[in-house]
Design a protein with these regions (language model features):
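C-terminal catalytic lobe of FAD-dependent flavoproteins
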Residues: 167, 318-378
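Glycine-rich FAD pyrophosphate-binding loop
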Residues: 32-55
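Active-site lid/adjacent beta-loop-alpha segment flanking the redox-cofactor pocket in flavoenzymes
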Residues: 258-340, 344-346
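Helical element adjacent to the flavin cofactor pocket in flavoenzyme catalytic cores
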Residues: 156-220
């Protein structure tokens, strides 16, 4: 039961954004930046963002060379280049909005490991890929460098080469989301957590967003609604082609004299690791168990964790003493290709979801485009 005051002051908004991850909060911020007097509400089902925005490894990246070679065959050159440019634009928007200090951005470079048992055929396309990307970046993006294998302390018997991207970096995911939350609040955006949106109803005048909590159920009202729930979107729109993909992540104890510095990936990006100070954060392995990892359930997959630990001990930090301090999971959203799903569902409802594991890079750009849709008739 709502009071008179709640009905009068706390239920009605100009815009409601469902989902308080990178895309959702950024969408609310863009709308507020462009329309300062707008009354905006963000609803989040968890006490913290539910999907991957606070659970990712903190890669400020555009994707590895092998990923791009694969994606070129999957979607063609025009779509690939647009996607890469959008990732780059998104990273610059995120850094500009929050500042590098607030997100602890470090431009330590990105590295793709080419393992001994892998074909290095994509390295043969390095020059041609650089040619394709030069109009966007005004420089060569990739170069091969075998010398860094020993410099980082890797097992050189397991790795035949590395491809370097000096444009990439890393962030502190927790600081970034904290800064984004604080920035949104400073603009006057209202954020309610623990509000599980169950139903969205629309008529010709407004949209009702039904949110449930352990205490009550409330129908919030807005002129327009933005859906930014990524892997959890099919709960509201079951017909959409959005498939969840769970990511397993672990973090080591502090390691003395750790040489690893930067962001790293291998096996077409299915495995990824980085240093955080003198620790290693390592995630991935979804391709070991696609079926089991196609879920929105936050559970550890022991098969994948065991493989991560094996790569750590045998290849990444083979001569170090450490323990695994923590494991966790994040839920991403994937589709038939690498393209995000950005569309109007009606005149009053639009969505920006399915970021294919690239939310840090794409979230701020998708937010700009989603805000364009939300404000198009205003």
């Amino acid at each position: 039961m709502l009071s008179f005051w709640e009905q009068k002051e706390l239920i009605h908004y100009d815009y409601i954004v469902v989902g308080s991850g990178i895309t959702g909060l950024s969408t609310a911020c863009v709308i507020k930046e462009r329309k300062p007097n707008a009354h905006i509400l963000v609803l989040e089902r968890g006490l913290l963002p539910t999907g991957a925005s606070t659970k990712n490894a903190g890669f400020a990246c555009i994707g590895s060379l092998s990923e791009k070679v694969y994606d070129l065959a999957l979607m063609g050159e025009d779509k690939l280049l647009q996607l890469i440019e959008n990732r780059w634009i998104g990273l610059q928007l995120l850094r500009k909005r929050l500042g590098d200090t607030a997100i602890d951005f470090q431009n330590n470079g990105g590295y793709e490991l080419i393992l001994n048992h892998e074909s290095n055929s994509h390295v043969e396309q390095l020059s041609s890929m650089n040619d394709r990307l030069r109009p966007i970046f005004k420089q060569d993006v990739f170069k091969e460098d075998k010398n860094k294998i020993n410099a980082f302390g890797f097992n050189a018997n397991k790795i035949q080469s590395m491809v370097v991207n000096s444009l990439e970096g890393q962030i502190n995911t927790g600081k970034m989301m904290n800064a984004l939350h604080q920035y949104a609040s400073s603009l006057g955006i209202k954020i309610i957590t623990g509000a599980d949106v169950s139903v969205i109803e629309e008529n010709d005048k407004y949209v009702l967003v039904h949110a449930n909590s352990s205490y009550n159920n409330i129908a919030f009202k807005a002129s327009k609604v933005a859906i930014c729930t990524n892997a959890f979107t099919r709960k509201l729109f079951p017909h959409l082609e959005i498939n969840p993909g769970r990511g397993q992540v672990l973090v080591t104890s502090p390691i003395s004299d750790l040489k690893v510095k930067g962001i790293f990936s291998f096996d077409e990006g299915f495995y990824y690791f980085r240093n955080f100070e003198n620790r290693i954060i390592f995630g991935g392995g979804r391709n070991l168990d696609f079926e089991k990892e196609a879920t929105t359930s936050f559970e550890t997959n022991e098969k994948i964790i065991a493989q991560l630990q094996q790569y750590l001990s045998e290849m990444i930090i083979p001569n170090y003493s450490y323990t695994i301090e923590q494991t966790w999971t994040g839920i991403m959203a994937f589709g038939p290709n690498k393209l995000p799903l950005l569309q109007s569902m009606s005149d009053r409802i639009a969505m920006g979801v399915r970021l294919n594991g690239m939310g840090v890079a794409l979230g701020s750009k998708i937010a700009e485009d989603l805000a364009d849709i939300m404000l198009s008739d205003d």
